[in-house]
Amino acid sequence: MTRRWTMGPEWIAILALVALFVVGTVLPINMGALAYVAAWLVGMYSLGLDEKEILAGISADLVLTLIGVTYLFAIARQNGTVDLIVRTAVASVGGRVALIPWVMFAVTAVITAIGAASPAACAIIGPIALGFAGRYGISPLMMGMFVVHGAQAGGFSPISIYGTITNSVMEDAGLGASHLTIFFSSLAVNTVMAAILFVVLGGRKLMRLRMDADGELVEAGAATGSATAAGGSETRVHPDRSDARSATGATPTTGTPNPGDAGTRLEHTLTLLAFLAVAVVALVFEKNIGFAAITAAVVLSILTPKAYKDTVKQIAWPTVLLVAGVSTYATILTTAGSPEFVGNWAAGLGAAAIGALILCYVGGVVSAFASSTALLPVIIPIAIPLVAEGGLSAGFFVAALAVSSTIVDVSPFSTNGALMLANKPDTIDENTYYKQILGYATIVTLVGPLLVWVALVLPGW
């Protein structure tokens, strides 16, 4: 008698994920809305969950972070405070435009390395970095991804959140911690990816540009005649910003506005103090950055209610829906056992190296839609058979898993990628920027785990 094969819930959840991704890419429908539909149907009719259990999967933390941060920065953009930060930061690099992305990368890396959550660091630095991109003609994709890669570059230090989780899980599994191996692996991979982005997305051109005393872009060029004796010449550059406003509030035709163009000195001071308070509350006292940001925004609105009465409309509501829906469906995936199903299958393969590669891809693909923090404790124990029986180095294998599961946080469906999308410069259309981030995230998800595996696992360190 032939045994009849039935499709398990783990397969149904995986196929539904593929379907909603395809539909959301082909049709102009918010993928968060599609994810809610998929979560409802798969949850009720495949997993037998009721609606309360399905709704319990929504990541309220991520949603509140997006709402609070975009609300606060909408106020800062409206009163000119972000523009003030931009001018100050430009001055700190001596007007050398090419250094701006690397400064943002380094600052974000330091913040996560000393213990900040990756989304918290991206929430604080991302809008400021994208303000630079909108003002000075830097690729928004490069700038946004520099912030995310910076967060991951420092994200596995021994005292960081990711580093603490990863090494603790290794010790609990009897593998022994590999603090420096994991940290420097993540630092190296993300720095290399940032360097590639810098070259591909116009970084070499930025090296010829600087800001003059009036805040305008100038390009150094070879001098002739009497200018040669003076040591060179400069050509003023005019980026095409005729149809958009920058994220910092400058109009395309006015360049860098004067400090008094928007808001007052008191408003700027109060807003800067609000930024500082949010950073201290979130990073030092380890409170939720979403609550901190929305509280700061409400306090500023109470102090000047008429000025900010319409600011709430500038919250990135489409992005909020995107993250809320996808995070809910990610819980359905986990409940269905899809990650464990694929991971256990990979661990059961005969070749340890091939099993390791498959696990790296499982980590990358799942983390592109779900929480990296939640995934790491799940996927690392699955790798134990490959370490015990396959002769793989525990430190480098776990490093490969950790890096593969976090470099994909550039995805617009993850918190970090969504924060970049939510704070896009006004010089780029939201749909265009979404497609750029999605395209880059797709490349990273498809190629990144393979390259990480080749560098860290295949040599058999």
Describe each model-derived feature in a short phrase:
Residues 1-65, 73, 199-334, 338, ...:
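Hydrophobic transmembrane alpha-helices of multi-pass small-molecule transporters
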Residues 4-13, 59-71, 119-122, 166, ...:
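Structural signature of hydrophobic alpha-helical transmembrane segments
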Residues 10-15, 33-36, 98-106, 120-124, ...:
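Hydrophobic alpha-helical transmembrane segments
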Residues 20-29, 107-117, 148-156, 281-285, ...:
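Transmembrane alpha-helix interface/packing and boundary motifs in multi-pass membrane proteins
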Residues 32-33, 116-129, 143, 157-163, ...:
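Transmembrane helix boundary and interhelical junction motifs in multipass membrane proteins
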Residues 49-135, 312-389, 397:
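Membrane-embedded alpha-helical segments and adjacent helix-loop junctions characteristic
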Residues 132-220, 418-455:
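Membrane-core helix-loop-helix motifs of multi-pass transport proteins
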Residues 178-195, 354-357, 365-380, 384-461:
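C-terminal transmembrane helix pair
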